[in-house]
Amino acid sequence: MKVMHLLPSLSSGGVEQVVVELCQGLCARGVETVVVSGGGPLEKDVTAAGARHITLPIGRKSIRTFLMVPRVAKLIREERPDVLHLHSRVPAWVGWLAARRVEKALRPLVVTSFHGFHSVNFYSAIMAKGDRVIAVSECMKRHILENYPATPEEKITVVPNSVDTSLNFPEYRPSDDWWRQWRHDYPELEGKFTLCLPGRITRIKGAAHLIPLLSDLRARGIPAHAVIVGETKKGKEALRQELEDAFAIAGLQDAVTWTGFRRDLRDVLCACDVTLSLTLIPESFGKTTLDALALGRPVAGYEHGGVGELLDVFLPQGKIPVGNTSAMADLLATWYQTPPTPKSPIPSPFRREDMLQGHLHVYAK
């Protein structure tokens, strides 16, 4: 079997990480794997797994990107993949149109993955046009059926994102060298009740909700400190500055650490006391939430989307009504005194092997 993945880039993000994990698992099972994207920091992880990477600008939201359709069609003819797996809307349009240009004898099975709750319109409908459609959670499947009713339910398979339990487990601890470097880089965290907010710097990630949350906890005498872990992508610099100014106005400039993009997120999650999910709109899954829970770290998050589903399974007390920072402060104040323990070990279908078998089952159809 040969699988070709199309996605915008290989920068940080949940979709990119899932593709890296698929490359690792598929290549280990002898499945020839090719990734087509605009490239990025995670490209080395793809090639280290044994997959090949082909750099093409197929992720830009521009009409010019559709000039890539003939090139991708040519690539399909040359590579002859059995499966064309499309992971995002612009690459999905390019890949779907390219596949339709290929002679039927060479046309691969087209699989699309709904990784997020996209706006419902013609542009997003491409994600439901695959021969097979993967939803990363039950709430994602409901979203597809409710908003794209022409999609037969039997065409949709729920394959949750996963965690590698050989790497993420409650007993895992960062190395002594890592701890020394962490304390050297961020001495302000010593003795603090650290709250990790992972994810790219975007408005919907809810970083602004840290302001009332930190203010409330500090008013109770709890030395709460936010650790915001994620890159500020080009075009988001003004938002980053807006957030920094808001923290400063609230007198919280010394209560926040910005780490930028970190390749060692597993260690960072272990180093922090609690991981937060403050997304203002539902997430389709919540990959970092699962990673933290697998490490035995408590997660407090807004009770919607995939994060709500995960907390239902692993730590129901961590669910907070969306936007209710007062309720979250009450919960965290309790956890400051008595940290909870998430459910362990990781059950099916959230293990890496479950995800790989789920994808192979879809590909085999």
What feature does the model see in each segment?
Residues 13-21, 193, 197-216:
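A conserved mid-protein helix/loop that constitutes part of the nucleotide-sugar donor-binding site
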Residues 234-240, 253-262, 268:
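Active-site donor-binding acidic/aromatic loop of nucleotide-activated sugar
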Residues 313-326, 333-339:
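Conserved acidic donor-binding segment of nucleotide-sugar-dependent glycosyltransferases
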Residues 36-41, 198, 225-241:
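Glycosyltransferase donor-sugar binding loop
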Residues 104-138:
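A conserved, positively charged/aromatic
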Residues 35, 298-301:
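Short hydrophobic beta-strand element within catalytic cores of glycosyltransferases
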Residues 86-92, 114:
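Short His-centered aromatic/hydrophobic patch
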Residues 14, 167-170, 174, 339-365:
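A charged, aromatic-enriched C-terminal amphipathic alpha-helix characteristic of glycosyltransferases
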